[in-house]
Amino acid sequence: MSFDSGCPPTPPVKLLFKKHSPFAVTPQRATSGAAGYDLCSSADVVVPPKSRSLIPTDLSFQFPRGVYGRIAPRSGLAVKFFIDVGAGVIDSDYRGIVSVLLFNFSDHNFNVRRGDRIAQLILERHLTPDLEERSGLDETARGAAGFGSTGGFDTGVCPSSFS
């Protein structure tokens, strides 16, 4: 079965990157269905307990038009070692070397070795609309109700597996 959208084929989109040292590792997707490209450390770094460290990749990127890069955590590092990622937006006009801010929430040093996969780069489309200030906004059923306002864990929608 084939799908014909009726539109002319779009040219392939490319993510351009530059290696700034022989220790930079080409980003790769672990599987064909992976959303992100794995980013690897270009140096040995220790992330102290309850602290953070900036991990170099020695890579810079040129994103397709209308796209920015988001640095996201790797789930295995979070689950096994309490490692998370911070400050994860790479603007489309940034051409400098990308580093990854790792937070260590554990009580032990986290040793990053050169070549270790430390995060993933996910490409996301973005809009930059013109701003228009208004004295009021359209009303909604939710209104200004904030954190936790849409319900807790006991919604009755999903059966509990903890009983």
Curated annotation (Swiss-Prot):
It is an enzyme of class 3 (hydrolase). Keywords: Hydrolase, Magnesium, Metal-binding, Nucleotide metabolism. GO terms for biological process: dUMP biosynthetic process; dUTP catabolic process. Its cofactor is Mg(2+). The keyword Hydrolase applies. Pathway: Pyrimidine metabolism; dUMP biosynthesis; dUMP from dCTP (dUTP route): step 2/2. Its EC number is 3.6.1.23. It catalyses: dUTP + H2O = dUMP + diphosphate + H(+). This is Deoxyuridine 5'-triphosphate nucleotidohydrolase. It comes from Avian adenovirus 8 (strain ATCC A-2A).
